[in-house]
Swiss-Prot record:
Source superkingdom: Bacteria
Cofactor: how bound: Binds 1 zinc ion per subunit.
Residues binding Zn(2+), per UniProt: 130, 134, 202
Topological relation to the membrane, as annotated: Multi-pass membrane protein
Family: Belongs to the peptidase M48B family.
EC code(s) of this entry: 3.4.24.-
Any one Gene Ontology cellular component term annotated for this protein: plasma membrane
First-tier enzyme category under EC: hydrolase
Protein name: Protease HtpX homolog
Localization: Cell inner membrane
Gene name as annotated: htpX
Keywords, ordered alphabetically: Cell inner membrane, Cell membrane, Hydrolase, Membrane, Metal-binding, Metalloprotease, Protease, Transmembrane, Transmembrane helix, Zinc
HAMAP family given in the database record: Pept_M48_protease_HtpX
Length: 318
């Protein structure tokens, strides 16, 4: 189903590029736009995960510089029956995390320094289990490509303005009015592409994540802390790249509060309630607790991401 959804997104992006090309340069512009869109789609499939990680200046970590965090992800991946993903850390005081990659064999999980500082090891395990669930459900392909394409769509309005805004452009079949329409429609289309990613995937990933880590309450507690942190601590990189907001476990943008048609995430309280109900039902989970997560084990420090040459503040694992 995710492959079909991804194909539909790619087709929509191509059609939108062709439409704007038609507004700017008629049939010739439409053909040029088609070639550009085809190239972007090919590039996005193979490189969109790298682009997202680069946008947040994430640094890959291993068991040498982040042994406790790396061990948590390793044991969770084993519980889920997944290949070991690459593990990244990005420097942000806002607690949050995301997963990316076109398939389980080429996947990565990323957490903020703020996440490791604010959450206990058990809560971090719940968050990482959620992200691994996205990888296992193959949500990451759709999520990553959507982030890249939505960002490109939002640029189409500016493209039309600079290259098609000439009132005397005889190649533009709809004239200046058509360009103005494109400037309005393109950002709206970017939002609709993000809305095309069903919010039910978050509930599914929450449930599967609870099964992977072995305790729904770990993730429930983490969601509450992350939501409170995201509401008060800005993520400047996310504000500059709003098309990636739907990739995070909690929306990183300011002003995201309501569980409605225009939200990229379900309401956090609803997600927590579902996890608490799962725990109260006594439902047997498919895997046991992660062996690496033990309240008596403490990490030495939050790893240095290498940004600015400064060591992030030490967190509760210290």
């Amino acid at each position: 189903m995710n492959l079909v959804r991804t194909a539909m997104l790619l087709a929509f992006m191509t059609a939108l590029f062709m439409f704007v090309g038609f507004l700017i340069g008629g049939r010739g512009g439409m053909m040029i736009a088609f070639l550009i869109a085809a190239g972007m789609n090919f590039f996005s499939y193979w490189n969109s995960d790298r682009m997202v990680l680069a946008a947040y200046r994430a640094h890959e970590i291993d068991e040498r510089n982040a042994p406790e965090f790396f061990a948590i992800v390793r044991d969770l991946a084993r519980n889920a029956g997944l290949p070991m993903p690459k593990v990244y850390l990005y420097d942000s005081p806002q607690p949050n995390a995301f997963a990316t990659g076109r398939n389980p064999e080429n996947a990565a999980v990323a957490a903020s320094t703020g996440l490791l500082q604010a959450l206990s090891p058990e809560e971090v395990a719940g968050v990482m289990a959620h992200e691994l669930a996205h990888i296992q459900n193959r949500d990451t392909l759709t999520m990553t490509i959507t982030a890249t394409l939505a960002g490109a769509i939002s640029m189409l309005g500016n493209f039309a303005f600079f290259f098609g805004g000439n009132r005397d452009n005889n190649n533009n079949p709809l004239g200046f009015v058509g360009v103005l329409v494109a400037m309005i429609v393109a950002p709206l289309a970017a939002m609709l592409v993000q809305m095309a990613i069903s919010r039910t995937r978050e509930y599914s990933a929450d449930r599967r994540g609870a099964e992977i880590c072995g305790n729904p309450l770990w993730l429930a507690s983490a969601l509450g802390k992350i939501a409170r942190g995201a509401a008060h601590v800005p993520n400047e990189d996310a504000e500059r790249n709003p098309a990636t907001a739907h990739m995070f476990i909690i929306n990183p943008l300011s002003g995201e509060r309501m569980d409605n048609l225009f939200s990229t995430h379900p309401d956090t309280e609803n997600r927590i309630a579902a996890l608490q109900e799962m725990a109260q039902s006594g439902m047997n989970v498919s895997t046991g607790p992660v062996r690496a997560v033990n309240p008596t084990r403490k990490s030495r420090s939050v790893p240095n991401t290498g940004r600015g040459g400064s060591q992030p503040p030490r967190g509760p694992w210290s």
